[in-house]
């Protein structure tokens, strides 16, 4: 859980500002 974005997702994934997998 990446609290920096407030969305669930593996920290190994690059995420968009929404916290979704890039």
Curated annotation (Swiss-Prot):
Main location (coarse class): secreted
Coiled coil: none
Subcellular location, record wording: Secreted, Extracellular space
Molecular function terms from GO: serine-type endopeptidase inhibitor activity
This protein's record includes keyword Zinc: no
Presence of keyword NAD: no
GO CC, alphabetical: extracellular region
Protein name, UniProt field: Chymotrypsin inhibitor
Originating species: Mythimna unipuncta
Lineage: Eukaryota, Metazoa, Ecdysozoa, Arthropoda, Hexapoda
């Amino acid at each position: 859980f990446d609290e920096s974005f407030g969305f669930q997702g593996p920290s190994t994934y690059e995420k968009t500002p929404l916290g979704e997998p890039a």
